[in-house]
Amino acid sequence: MKKRIISTILTLGLAASVLGACGGSGQAEGTKKAEGTSPEKVENKADGEKTELLLWMPPFGTEDTLDKETWENILAPFEEENNCHVTVEIIPWANYEEKYLTAISSGQGPDLGYMYMEMMNDYIDMGALEPFDSYLSDADKEKFYYLDKGVVNAKQYALPIVVGNARVLYYNKTLLNQAGVSKAPETWEEFKDACKSLKGAGITPFQQQWGDASKGSLNELYFPYLWQAGGDLFTEDGKEAIFNSDAGIKAAKFIYSLKEEGYLPDSTTSMNWNEINEQFKGGKLGFCVAGTNKAPGFTEAGVDWDYVTTLKDARGGTFVAADCLVLLSGSKHKDLSAKMALYMLSGESMTKFHEMAPFAPVAKDEEYHDNEDFKKIYEEEQDSLHVLPAVKGSAAIYDILYKNLQLMMLGELSPEEAINESAKYANEALAQN
């Protein structure tokens, strides 16, 4: 993350280098395709000679080789049909952003890659990504569920491939029954009422990981409540932070009130997610917020659980991942790479991928293969799902916001101070973009 932020400040000459070779086969630096010239004319190979493509993907299987083998098997028919060879490289999560930064700065990036929204805008800003708009037919646009989540600056810079792991409010049905809570809460007020009943029965109502080192915890700790209060993080153009609205402050006050009223234990300020996970699995918590991918562990632990997709204040809202395929502008084979992206996103390909990594379908030509318990989230509650916007420098902004909210939970800042100071930093940073 730090390397990415530094790169946006110092530039590192990336705007020039993205015109270099991608996957070892890029066009010469400084050259441009003539307007109206079909990229296919640039990409034609001598009869019988295979076109080489480089694909970067992250690991989702139990080990890197499983991912590599899965994608190689999925892409084998595509290779045969298009006289090409696809080199699949699995990039570990631990150095994912650094790998992209280093490779693209030296002109050695892939033809087609996988990015999450938070990292995307910096590469768009430096011209490293090519929009997919000209490669999508009307039928494609009708087929895909989440194309809007890959639109940045009014262009289709990304095609969502993994949309899921929504953050939901889990509850322990056994504990709620013991506390006399007969109905799952739907609103903030009902949630507090349920917490009051749990506390009265000697049960820890709720827990949050305010001691966790990762600012990604905001996906559970603050962002859902901001959206539920009717707020948002940034203006649509990404030029201004607006989480210091009345809704943003209301969300912070609500969270802090849970601690003030004893529904969040004092230990919340030192807790990390793994500790909360173990507490819920151990039947010690009434509620926790977590991704849908945590459900199998809860079931295996013997917890009689259910969930609420989102509490409501002004509206419903919760975080969902929307990770995407991106087309690198330095690729010499854009047409074929875009064609490969659409092939990977076809129902047949996604069905094979989801056998390894269960996620919700991204298009209408695939049946639902994820946990049936969460099917309604993606089919009936899409309007409540929010992704983090692709805003340049947002990682540093989230870091400051998280630290100030942690200070709020420690009682060192008021909710107003935590939000307003974070927004002040954010808008000063955004003004430099």
Regions found by a protein language model. Give the residues of each.
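Periplasmic solute-binding protein
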Residues: 123-128, 146-184, 210-236, 319-326, ...
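Short, solvent-exposed loop/beta-turn-alpha elements that line the ligand-binding surface or hinge
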Residues: 130-144, 148, 206-213, 229-250, ...
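Hinge/lid segment of periplasmic solute-binding proteins
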Residues: 45, 49, 116-167, 192, ...
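Conserved C-terminal helix/tail region of periplasmic/extracytoplasmic solute-binding proteins
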Residues: 86, 177, 260, 380-433
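Short helix-initiation/N-cap motifs at beta->coil->alpha
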Residues: 91-99, 118, 186-192, 267-281
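Conserved N-terminal structural module of periplasmic/extracytoplasmic solute-binding proteins
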Residues: 4-7, 22-122, 141, 183, ...
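C-terminal lobe and pocket-closing loops
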Residues: 288-304, 313-403, 431-432
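Glycine-centered hinge/linker elements that transmit conformational signals in sensory
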Residues: 194-197, 237-268
